[in-house]
Amino acid sequence: MKIRKSTLSDESDVKALWGYCFEPPTDPFFQWYFKELAKPEEILVGENQGSIACDLHRRPYDLSIRGLRYPVDYIVGVATHPAARMRGYAKELIRGEFHLALKEDKPFVILMPSAASFYLPMGFGFYAHQWERSAAPERLAALGRRAESCRTLTSSNDWKDLASIYREYTKKRNGWAYRDEKSWEKHIDAQLLEGYIAVTYDRKGPSGYLFYTLDDRKMIASEMAFKNEAGRKALYAFMAGHQGSVDTCVWYEPLDDHSFRYWQDGAEHTYIKNRTFPFMLGRVIDPVIAFDGLPCSKEIKGEIA
């Protein structure tokens, strides 16, 4: 199988493969993705006997790890033509991505797996875990506190409000993606195709935001960020305000969050489900670039035998 970057002449085949495996061409996200985001040079294809057997999309990101900035490929849309499956083509293509990332001095590649068991034998490992929490909206009311004000976004014009929250939320954490104006606009536009964005405010300005969808009487918050505890409680109150509209709210918070220890009346596992949820895989491509000069926390103590 020949592995190469796609060209404009591959566009119809690439779209057809995405449409078969993911969203159909009539889906708004499909149309937006291939108009605004996908670039031929960021798509890797596996060609067999003159036809595209498989492909993957390489979304470029910069991650913050211990204060250093690393360029990475975020792999999405791994797809194999139905007539070419069960032949190991996708794994061969992913290994081709490893070689290309190494050539481009990218120390890691990352992805969000639909089936982790497919990727683990290729050297991937979970590097990001989070809390998955769910509760009936009326139960969240006891933990929330109404914001000074709240609104839902209808465009990416107010991206700076979200950026200020995200910056505060991530500043002491690792593995988060750098976002500039252009990436924020794309991120917001993609969310508004399929769902909603709520922003809460206190007297000082933006305090929290929520990316969410409503489907089958369930609210699912795919991204949540806040500047402080008041911002978190404001988002809880926003979700609680959907009593009568939804039966369940599902949201995610970072693994270093210990707020559940202070929930009232033994809420954890009683009326708020709280479980760890691994969700991102990473694979080290170049250990030297990845670890050379990486600082360690001054709080770490110990000896090397």
Feature-to-residue mapping (PLM):
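Conserved active-site alpha-helix within GNAT-family acetyltransferase domains
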Residues: 103-107, 113-131, 256-272
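A short, internal acetyl-CoA/4′-phosphopantetheine-binding micro-motif in the GNAT/acyltransferase core
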Residues: 75-85, 114, 218-229
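Intrinsically disordered, low-complexity, positively biased terminal segments
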Residues: 146-305
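Conserved acetyl-CoA pyrophosphate-binding loop and the N-cap/start of the following alpha-helix
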Residues: 84-96, 230-234
